[in-house]
Each structure stands twice: as structure tokens, then as C-alpha cells.
């Protein structure tokens, strides 16, 4: 049975996005393929970061014990794990549970194009201040659903202008929910 490198699990009130205010279990998987300038979880992406090796049934058991109906798979980048679809499938076997996948936008989501609204993608689009924009998987824009979220982390006026370009180019407001999130102490007048 496959195992997943889990650096932490915790229950908290979701603080951002479409599901803000809801109680959620966060499952943070180890590893990321990007190195964003403003990353707030670099510790979870280091090679020597401590983690538990958990199977999908063990993770499902933790979700059941927590008694929540919203699970947020985050990282790092949770879609890097080649077996994450097994974990997603196991979690969705729980009838009332919804999953929100926080993805950095660099990994293809086409494998999840056939899904209902119990599986939501919250996808970052990395802007110039992240130093990672060249890694964005633009084909992901084709696979967004109306219940998905595209999040732009804004660290400069250049970022704001670029976000506007991307929103217009891909007609994102017609495809998904769009959010801006500021990088604190970055934008100057």
C-alpha cells in the first residue's frame, strides 16, 4: 500500500478563499517544486523536514476522528505525489466530505477534469514577485470548474497589472472564482 509524506495534520477554521469560516482538517504533504519568494511553509519542503508516512486508510481514519466535512490538501504541492489520486478517492468515499486541493498551479490538473463540486481546486497563479511565473501550467485554465478558485498573491503593482492580464486573457471570471491575496508589507504607494 502506498504511503504519503505528511508533515502535519490539524483542524482549524479555514481562513481564506471560498470555504473561509468553515472548520477543516488540513493535511500538509511534504515537498514542492517551486521556491516562491514569499513562501510561508518553506520548512515543510526541505529534504530533512520531519514527516509521517501514512497510508490513505490511516489519513481517512484521522479525518473521521476529527469529525469534519472539509479536508484541505496542501503543501508544498500536494499534486506532486503520483499517488495522490488514490488518497483523494479514499477521502471522497466518505459521503459528506468535501476536498479542497491547494495547488501552486505548476502541476497539470487535467487528471481531475471529471469531478463534481466535492473536489475543489484552489489554484495559485504565480505572479512576477514570486519569481516562479515561468513554471505555471497554463493548460490548467482549460480544466477549471465554476466552483474552483484561482488565487493571485499580489506583492507589487506589477503583480496587480499581470493578474489583470491573466484574468482577461483566460476569461477567468467566467470560469472560476478569482481572489487576490496580498503579500503583507510588500506593496508601497
Predicted regions and their residues:
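A short beta-strand-turn-helix
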Residues: 12-17
Amino acid at each position: 500500500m502506498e504511503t504519503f509524506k505528511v508533515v502535519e495534520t490539524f483542524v482549524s477554521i479555514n481562513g481564506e478563499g471560498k470555504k473561509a469560516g468553515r472548520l477543516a482538517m488540513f493535511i500538509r504533504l511534504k515537498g514542492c517544486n517551486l521556491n516562491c519568494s514569499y513562501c510561508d511553509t518553506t520548512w515543510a519542503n526541505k529534504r530533512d523536514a520531519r514527516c509521517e508516512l501514512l497510508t490513505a486508510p490511516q489519513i481517512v481514519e484521522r479525518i473521521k476522528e476529527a469529525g469534519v466535512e472539509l479536508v484541505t490538501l496542501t503543501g508544498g504541492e500536494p499534486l506532486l505525489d503520483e499517488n495522490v489520486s488514490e488518497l483523494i478517492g479514499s477521502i471522497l468515499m466518505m459521503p459528506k466530505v468535501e476536498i479542497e486541493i491547494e495547488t501552486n498551479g505548476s502541476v497539470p490538473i487535467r487528471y481531475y477534469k471529471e469531478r463534481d463540486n466535492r473536489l475543489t481546486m484552489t489554484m495559485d497563479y504565480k505572479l512576477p514577485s514570486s519569481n516562479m511565473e515561468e513554471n505555471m501550467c497554463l493548460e490548467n485554465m482549460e480544466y477549471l470548474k465554476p466552483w474552483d478558485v484561482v488565487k493571485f498573491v499580489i506583492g507589487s503593482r506589477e503583480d496587480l497589472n499581470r493578474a489583470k492580464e491573466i484574468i482577461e486573457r483566460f476569461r477567468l471570471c467566467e470560469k472560476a472564482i478569482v481572489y487576490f491575496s496580498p503579500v503583507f508589507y510588500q506593496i508601497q504607494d
